[in-house]
């Protein structure tokens, strides 16, 4: 679920997820189009694509099982669909952490769709 994803992001990056990522670049937050603007925005693009591949459950609302082991996220549970959601969220949270050095909220926060032309969109 989005709430679990927020917790993963907070723990991995130390940032407040909604403030830091919900309005970043062309793909972080709701929707997405255009070309990802930097590595963090690409994390969101890949996460959106990952969610598109999930079938049989709702990535935004269905809770899944996960735990922390040695600073890493471990997805668990018996439901393969929910585990898939968890793996999408896990990969994005790690991606955000690994790209903190190029995160640029001054440049890409509240970027707006007008700066993300539909014709520049990439396939998943």
Swiss-Prot record:
Ca(2+) binds at residues 27, 29, 31, 48. Transmembrane segments: none annotated. SUPFAM superfamilies: Phospholipase A2, PLA2. It is an enzyme of class 3 (hydrolase). One of its GO terms (biological process) is arachidonate secretion. The active site is at 47, 89. It catalyses: a 1,2-diacyl-sn-glycero-3-phosphocholine + H2O = a 1-acyl-sn-glycero-3-phosphocholine + a fatty acid + H(+). Disulfide bonds join 26-116, 28-44, 43-95, 49-124, 50-88, 57-81, 75-86. It comes from the Eukaryota. Expressed by the venom gland. Belongs to the phospholipase A2 family. Group II subfamily. D49 sub-subfamily. PLA2 catalyzes the calcium-dependent hydrolysis of the 2-acyl groups in 3-sn-phosphoglycerides. This is Acidic phospholipase A2 BA1. It comes from Gloydius halys (Chinese water mocassin).
